[in-house]
């Protein structure tokens, strides 16, 4: 076979491989939506687009690109929103901006007055569902008026309010174990108005705790809204 023929074949092979695409965080993939096979689509009212300021470079390794559409995720039939209006506590007793009640008030808009800001370093918020429940999804909006990625995002579920026993970790993108809860295998992601859906995997617990450790724009921690979906116990 001539050298030119070999080069043509190599070029075709590379072209076909690139057509396979990659995970752009757009919700769903070649294998279909995530979540429970045979389940029903999880739906929530999405906030309008609002981009302010100049984003800073995001240098997080293995970063998932910003999605171009709402995520596709399936949950068991009968799954309900469990977190609306529920009590939220935090490792930061006095948030810099906003009130912890904003996390479960149902409003996902960006901008001043819609988010709570916690101090720097590793911090957590915790939602009390009121009873031990089967959790199938945790939908998170940290801050979406600027493209950024939050560091050391860990999501845990437990019946223990102190999170010392019976803890199930359903998401962890702390790749270097900064938070001292084990190295996570999940990838950091870019914040958008579509939020981030974490698979609850049917974990049971009354409390849902979310950690973060600053972001690519500044050292603070933010939450606009967190929605916990599942079946009450």
Predicted segments, located by residue:
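C-terminal motif of bacterial Sec signal peptides marking the signal peptidase cleavage site
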Residues: 17-18
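N-terminal pre-domain segments of enzymes
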Residues: 30-79
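A short glycine/threonine-centered beta-strand motif
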Residues: 129-131, 158
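Ser/Thr/Gly/Pro-rich low-complexity, disordered linker/stalk segments of secreted
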Residues: 21-31
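Sec-dependent signal peptide recognition
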Residues: 2-9
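A short beta-strand element within beta-rich, extracytoplasmic domains
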Residues: 88, 134-145, 210
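Trp- and acidic/polar-enriched beta-sheet ligand-binding modules for extracellular glycan
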Residues: 32-53, 117-123, 145-233
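Predominantly extracellular/luminal regions of secreted and cell-surface proteins
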Residues: 71-107
């Amino acid at each position: 076979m001539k050298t030119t023929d070999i080069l043509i074949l190599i070029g075709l092979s590379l072209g076909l491989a690139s057509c396979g695409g990659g995970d752009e965080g757009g919700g769903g993939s070649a294998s279909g939506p995530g979540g429970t096979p045979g389940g029903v689509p999880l739906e929530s009212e999405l906030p309008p687009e609002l981009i302010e300021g100049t984003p800073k470079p995001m240098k997080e390794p293995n970063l998932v690109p910003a999605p171009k559409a709402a995520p596709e995720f399936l949950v068991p039939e009968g799954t309900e929103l469990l977190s609306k209006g529920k009590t939220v506590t935090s490792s930061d007793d006095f948030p810099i901006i906003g009130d912890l009640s904003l996390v479960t008030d149902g409003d996902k808009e960006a901008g001043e007055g819609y988010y709570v800001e916690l101090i720097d370093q590793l911090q957590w918020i915790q939602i009390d569902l009121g009873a031990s429940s089967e959790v199938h999804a945790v939908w998170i909006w940290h801050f979406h008026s600027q493209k950024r990625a939050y560091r050391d995002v860990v999501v845990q579920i437990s019946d223990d309010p102190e999170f010392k026993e019976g803890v199930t970790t359903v998401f962890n993108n702390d790749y270097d174990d900064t938070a001292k809860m084990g190295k996570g295998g999940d990838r950091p992601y870019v914040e958008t108005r579509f939020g981030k859906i974490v698979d609850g995997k049917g974990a049971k617990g009354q409390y849902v705790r979310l950690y973060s450790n600053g972001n690519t724009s500044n050292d603070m921690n933010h939450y606009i809204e967190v929605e916990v979906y599942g079946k009450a116990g």
